[in-house]
């Protein structure tokens, strides 16, 4: 099974498809962010970070899934997990003001709420 399918299976095992997120589910939102990042030809680490961008919970949304960092690293890889951790543990204002283009692309995809 490929990495994308492993990620999808993990997200479904956490019942993210049953968690409301605006007018859709948390699962649909995360897949939408991933798909947007793929469409704009982002590298794999950014796309998989987008797929898991709010898995730890942040100042705007927390599904209280509480996965360990090691668990997420094993699923999406250490580079993607590092982006996810930063996304969830840094204020949005600070992220938007950073020079990190990878994070900014995830922020953009999230903001568009694809």
Give the role of each language-model region:
Residues 1-114:
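Metal-dependent phosphohydrolase cores
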């Amino acid at each position: 099974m490929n990495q994308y399918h492993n990620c999808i299976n993990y997200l479904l095992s956490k019942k993210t498809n049953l968690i409301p997120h605006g007018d859709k589910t948390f699962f649909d939102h995360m897949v939408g962010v991933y798909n947007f990042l793929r469409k704009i030809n982002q590298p794999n680490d950014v796309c998989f970070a987008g797929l898991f961008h709010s898995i730890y919970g942040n100042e705007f949304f927390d599904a209280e899934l509480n996965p360990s960092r090691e668990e997420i690293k094993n699923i999406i890889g250490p580079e993607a997990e590092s982006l996810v951790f930063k996304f969830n543990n840094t204020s949005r204002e600070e992220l938007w003001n950073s020079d990190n283009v990878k994070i900014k692309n995830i922020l953009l995809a999230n903001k568009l709420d694809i």
